[in-house]
Amino acid sequence: MFRYELIGTDGGARRGVFHTPRGPVRTPGFMPVGTLGTVKGLTIDQVAATGADMILGNTYHLRLRPGHETVAALGGLHKMCGWDGPILTDSGGFQVFSLGAINKVNEHAATFRSHIDGAKIELTPEHSIEIQQALGSDVAMVLDHVIALPAPMTQVEDALARSIRWAARCRIAADREDQALFAIVQGGLDRTLRQQCASELAAMSFEGYAVGGLSVGEPPEDMYTTTGFTTPHLPADKPRYLMGVGTPRDLLENIARGIDLFDCVMPTRNGRNALAFTDEGPLKLRNAVHKLDTRPLMEDCPCLACRHSRGYLRHLFVAGEMLGPILLSHHNLMYYGRLMQATRDAIEAGEFEAFKNAKLAGWGHEPFQETV
């Protein structure tokens, strides 16, 4: 029912298709984040127009609002939000990290205080799977223990061991044949721990494998290095997903190291704050230099924003018009979607390295090389 088809490789980069009951997911691919069943500011049709094959929903937030039972009563996440393609739901594990001041973690569960009303919520691996099954996502994630980096080795080892045990509990609890389950590799920035975790999780036969616990405070170069020594220990016949990443540079550097799937709020969050991604690098449209600029953000971009001038887009933000965040969110997701399509084409043509280096140069970056 779920199958990863590897079409070709170019160096470490992989071109493939993740086949799901609701349609194929082309890889490398980027998943727009619809935390509460909506990609902020955009309609489902607008999201689809950016080239996305799969979107992401958030288990923790949907558990609180409107509640997973409510989502199920409304026909599941797909019917509720109107998305016909595949949906991936995260497990709530990242909230253990991001809302750490109001959470506690022990072997049994992560205990939350709702950021909405302060209600106590106990999230066990089994309850995380129960919620994701009620939501009806196509891909569920195991519950893991995320920590900030850098961290003491004892803390990294403890979170790693707990994540492996929780993954095993999720594997037992996940009994829907129409829902894939992805494991999450932890281990901080330590090569030995990452490889140990990858090997132990690979033995549990998940439908896909995520690299988690990165983009949590470490320098980008440490992320790239860690991805590079982790992916060789993951099954080649399963999709590889780097969670919560990232900038256009992050995407290309990690694709070079064997990653297939990404998600991040960066395109839409930055779009709501007047920052547009382009081949010239990011443009901050509130800057006065754009006031009289008649050019579009990009000449060849088919998004809604690029029908207008940079000066008009700046005006929308300065005036506080809601159209500004909508247009830039659409542009940024379109930019990410087109970047992924161009990347897939470059891999198939055997030109990925040259493509990556040209893009990085346009953004003002040098290719990253690990030190031996």
Curated annotation (Swiss-Prot):
- The residues forming the signal peptide are none
Domain of life according to the entry: Bacteria
- The entry marks the following residues as binding substrate, namely 90-94, 144, 186, 213
List the active site.
Answer: 90, 263
As its record notes, the protein acts as a catalyst of: 7-aminomethyl-7-carbaguanine + guanosine(34) in tRNA = 7-aminomethyl-7-carbaguanosine(34) in tRNA + guanine
Cite the cofactor comment. Binds 1 zinc ion per subunit.
Pfam family of this protein, just one?
TGT
Record's InterPro entries?
ArchSynthase1/Queuine_TRR (IPR050076), TGT (IPR004803), TGT-like_sf (IPR036511), tRNA_ribo_trans-like (IPR002616)
Q: Which EC class is this protein assigned?
A: transferase
Q: Does the keyword Cytoplasm apply?
A: no
Gene Ontology annotations of biological process type:
queuosine biosynthetic process; tRNA wobble guanine modification; tRNA-guanine transglycosylation
Give the E.C. number(s).
Answer: 2.4.2.29
A Gene Ontology cellular-component term: cytoplasm
Q: What's one GO MF term for it?
A: metal ion binding
For the ligand (Zn(2+)), the binding residues are: 301, 303, 306, 331
Q: In which pathway does it act?
A: tRNA modification; tRNA-queuosine biosynthesis
Q: Which SUPFAM superfamilies match?
A: tRNA-guanine transglycosylase
Which terms are listed as keywords in the entry?
Answer: Glycosyltransferase, Metal-binding, Queuosine biosynthesis, Transferase, tRNA processing, Zinc
Please list the cofactors this protein needs: Zn(2+)
Task: Specify where the region named RNA binding lies, as residue ranges.
Answer: 244-250, 268-272
Which PANTHER family does the entry mention? QUEUINE TRNA-RIBOSYLTRANSFERASE
Subunit details: Homodimer. Within each dimer, one monomer is responsible for RNA recognition and catalysis, while the other monomer binds to the replacement base PreQ1.
Protein family (similarity comment) = Belongs to the queuine tRNA-ribosyltransferase family.
Per the entry, what this protein does is: Catalyzes the base-exchange of a guanine (G) residue with the queuine precursor 7-aminomethyl-7-deazaguanine (PreQ1) at position 34 (anticodon wobble position) in tRNAs with GU(N) anticodons (tRNA-Asp, -Asn, -His and -Tyr). Catalysis occurs through a double-displacement mechanism. The nucleophile active site attacks the C1' of nucleotide 34 to detach the guanine base from the RNA, forming a covalent enzyme-RNA intermediate. The proton acceptor active site deprotonates the incoming PreQ1, allowing a nucleophilic attack on the C1' of the ribose to form the product.
Its name, as the record gives it, is Queuine tRNA-ribosyltransferase
Supply the source organism for this entry: Rhodopirellula baltica (strain DSM 10527 / NCIMB 13988 / SH1)
Protein's gene: tgt
